[in-house]
Amino acid sequence: MVGVIRRLNVVRELLNIRAGPGAALLPKEVTKVHMQFAHRIEEGHMGPRKFWRENLPKLKYWNPAVPMVINRTTDQKGPAVMTIYFRDDKDAKPSSTPFPTSSADGSSPAPKPAQGERIVTIDMKNRNSSVILKEFLDKTGAVAVQPTAKDEEEFREFEDLHRRSEIDRERIRKMNDAKKREKAMLAKAMSDAQSIKAASA
């Protein structure tokens, strides 16, 4: 049972990251992606956070060479902005200035575009993650990745495993309940026997 659950979790993670909203190939002109939003979801930061947790991993999976940096701040009333960097000059050499690493203390703001680059921003505040994703795909020209036949087959296998695991889980629950009832009945019988014995002494 534990092995089945472990396999279910692995299959679920693979399917979730390979397909679905956010699985898309970015054009080569996109050089970097930067997101800034607050730690908590209040004040309009729920959509950006959900995009970061659910959509960005898929984008990173399909575009491993594109740096994607997250700058989380403690300013709930502050902006929630995505900055997308494009290379305008196809012959321009990549910038030698290191792109900042992700930060949880607001210390990695979006840098200015390098020479030969331009930026496009998306205001994410008070917006649903699906709306943010649509604007991202529209502005970048990214192409959504469709599930392959193998993905669909694995999804069917996952559904079958999930269904069987639910059946097994219910069967084990009933067995455990029966054992508990049997144990309770045995304890009651022993208690009754002790009471009868004590009464007849």
Curated annotation (Swiss-Prot):
<feature type="compositionally biased region" description="Polar residues">
    <location>
        <begin position="94"/>
        <end position="106"/>
    </location>
</feature>
<dbReference type="InterPro" id="IPR040049">
    <property type="entry name" value="Ribosomal_mS25/mL61"/>
</dbReference>
<keyword id="KW-0687">Ribonucleoprotein</keyword>
<protein>
    <recommendedName>
        <fullName>Large ribosomal subunit protein mL61</fullName>
    </recommendedName>
</protein>
<dbReference type="GO" id="GO:1990904">
    <property type="term" value="C:ribonucleoprotein complex"/>
</dbReference>
<dbReference type="InterPro" id="IPR007741">
    <property type="entry name" value="Ribosomal_mL43/mS25/NADH_DH"/>
</dbReference>
<comment type="similarity">
    <text>Belongs to the mitochondrion-specific ribosomal protein mL61 family.</text>
</comment>
<dbReference type="Pfam" id="PF05047">
    <property type="entry name" value="L51_S25_CI-B8"/>
</dbReference>
<feature type="region of interest" description="Disordered">
    <location>
        <begin position="87"/>
        <end position="118"/>
    </location>
</feature>
<keyword id="KW-0689">Ribosomal protein</keyword>
<dbReference type="GO" id="GO:0003735">
    <property type="term" value="F:structural constituent of ribosome"/>
</dbReference>
<keyword id="KW-0496">Mitochondrion</keyword>
<comment type="subunit">
    <text>Component of the mitochondrial large ribosomal subunit (mt-LSU). Mature N.crassa 74S mitochondrial ribosomes consist of a small (37S) and a large (54S) subunit. The 37S small subunit contains a 16S ribosomal RNA (16S mt-rRNA) and 32 different proteins. The 54S large subunit contains a 23S rRNA (23S mt-rRNA) and 42 different proteins.</text>
</comment>
<dbReference type="InterPro" id="IPR036249">
    <property type="entry name" value="Thioredoxin-like_sf"/>
</dbReference>
<dbReference type="GO" id="GO:0005739">
    <property type="term" value="C:mitochondrion"/>
</dbReference>
<dbReference type="GO" id="GO:0005840">
    <property type="term" value="C:ribosome"/>
</dbReference>
<comment type="function">
    <text>Component of the mitochondrial ribosome (mitoribosome), a dedicated translation machinery responsible for the synthesis of mitochondrial genome-encoded proteins, including at least some of the essential transmembrane subunits of the mitochondrial respiratory chain. The mitoribosomes are attached to the mitochondrial inner membrane and translation products are cotranslationally integrated into the membrane.</text>
</comment>
